[in-house]
């Protein structure tokens, strides 16, 4: 038996170099087929085993052993640096186009997701774990690294399918492992490249390799990217979503003996530009304002702002209901609730009438135009009209120490790592320009009563006036800058004063992690070998915040606060802190450890068996709260946190008493494992069958009002994977063909939805199956074709009732959809007897008459009606009167059984070809690639056509001229040749934002020229 090299073994996964084109395959525990590499060598291609076509066998360590790719059964796609260059794979978005059953798209809240075989990062939140393991130099890292670009890469390997036994707790979909180039101790070398392209794109990459002694070497690499934005902004006649970023990496390697190697790697990246987390928002405008956007199609419209928190709640109808809802603390089952609510409502309306609030329409008060009535949404995916330009600032550091020593038949590998990541990003929340609208007269009134020079001056309003309009209404309205003090404009924290409302959000995060792993493996000559290891991970994040603000929220906070303060006897202005929405995860902690091992049985030269097991243990803690208009404070307060911390508001309604934070701890443990049986028919043909179990830990949902039936936690997910495959080489190497079939039984798959402006997560079970075929065809040594095709079927396997936020009626035409004017969410009224539409409408009409609101109006094309009202009041009124209806505060759920999982295209294929032409000492290599991704759905509800993402294709081409011995080269390229604006993914916002759809697309057509050198 040959010695097994575990030089590259690590915390997540180890891989090896590939030939000069994409190579895919499936991996086995065939130890005796593994080439021998000393610790001073890179595990990579085996030139001694090169076939007649001239491309070398690929050696990988995906099972923590050096093995030929064609000998091992885990579906793997691998890319060398040369391959990345020739297929124009500069970032993960381009990478996914060439992979079977893999998609990658941007997501909501500054996130992104890899989806492998239908399993992706559908869980959004501080305590969520990624379903796809991401590793840099085999150290687990966060997904932020996927926002950068690839440089000085030795190889990238994507493992498809659960990898939990060897690679950890959160690899249920697979692993993406990025291996950077290491120092060469034998020679000095350097490389550099400059690229210029459209969008005034300038990209510089370089590296230098220096052997310091015979046993010590250093390698330094870096890149810089600067380009204009892809998104045109007609409001400013500029563009945004540009890049200004750089990264560098240093690697120090020490090989004191042939059996020992130590690598120390330091990585740093920084970005400061106008990258946008949003690209385009689509909406089929709802003329009633009850939904904002209709659940029919994705159109180039704008939401009806009357459906938003700033439009519905800050109306002359909504604000009194907001005050009454906040003041009446009786349960809706109390007989006194309805009369108390109506009395409170009657007392607040006269106080608010002079302040120029907008109107959604009610008896005697006609509707006023909503804030987006004149907003423009240009019908182009890369053109917007926005008055707030995004900002994006990130800083990442990753440090890795790897040590390996071979004691003979036993080898020990150690990996230790530390990382830190910071994010501070803002963006226009609605990608639209909205004026002050109906609030403008209110600011004139505020000037009249708050300016000491006015004959109507009242000192009660002076502080409110000075904070919002210190220069009078003509000088613009000052707006809060969302920050941790929670005071905004009323504590002097403002972004400026404007003639329109700047609707924007802000994401902030600061996280650290530490990990350590050790494993021991054997290389005995008998039929039995083993691997044993353990890993510990600790992560801490603080002040993970998400803010949303506009002038309407500032005005609501100050106006309601001042009136409430007057009711409490105050004679000066007050406000309700915070005057903006803030989801604040003050602290998150993760402690995780795993113990794993595998046993390898080689019965003969053809038949092998692998048995593995892993124990996972995860502990999570989070302290969080969501603030908006919670604590009454005097204007001029500079920090609202003492009020929040001191009992000024209750942030955990699930626990009796006043809680300053919602705190929760969870602990999960699971056993996972795998069994693999492979049979080598010939040296060129392998078949295998495997079973594996993957696991991803559960987590904690953000704190929400108990009005919404949202569980406090979400469960861990597990997947049982069954896979068969065959790997083949034919025609003396002219064809390599690998085929894999798989079936997954998924339990408690985590997926997210937006409730009350917050991501919450649910669990479902699913069945997944599919087939993948991958081929490399080389008719001649100069002509190479690579191709792959995949089929994927996913479906929810259980009866699971979930409420679709787009349509809380659940498709029933006898329902009445309610826009709650106190909180801007949607509830639904259903008749007790199905089909009794008159009963549900009659109940709402009678109740709204008591509230002074209009009755029901036609809303959806199927006959469903809607109305503005107060959901809690309707619930109390039903209990008081016994009306034959049900009031469902979180909507009427629908059964999603049989629906497809999001981001799971049924068909996906790609084909690429390159031809090498010798011209004297030069070579000319033209290449073209065609990639197709089939249709998919963006949500679990599978509504047609609004949730459907159509299939699309991307065409890339380039031609490169290499100098003698490849010392220099010149390359011309074009990516997305047809300028396709295809959608890669979508996300539906929540009801208080109007239910518009954020969509994300492929990158636009790029073209340019690059020149580089190597020595």
Task: Pin down the residues of each PLM region.
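Acidic, small-polar-rich N-terminal luminal/periplasmic segments of exported/outer-membrane proteins
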Residues: 46, 53-185, 724
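Outer-membrane beta-barrel translocator/receptor signature
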Residues: 129-131, 143, 151-154, 160, ...
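Transmembrane beta-strands of outer-membrane beta-barrel pores
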Residues: 194-200, 224-228, 268-272, 407, ...
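Solvent-exposed loop segments that connect transmembrane elements
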Residues: 231-239, 276-385, 430-504, 546-585, ...
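Structural signature of Gram-negative outer-membrane beta-barrels, strongest in the C-terminal barrel
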Residues: 255, 520-523, 529, 533-539, ...
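Membrane-embedded beta-barrel scaffold of Gram-negative outer-membrane proteins
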Residues: 404-407, 411-417, 424-427, 686-696, ...
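C-terminal beta-signal and adjacent terminal beta-strands/loops
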Residues: 794, 931-941, 961-1015
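C-terminal beta-barrel architecture of Gram-negative outer-membrane proteins
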Residues: 827-868, 887, 901-963, 975-979, ...
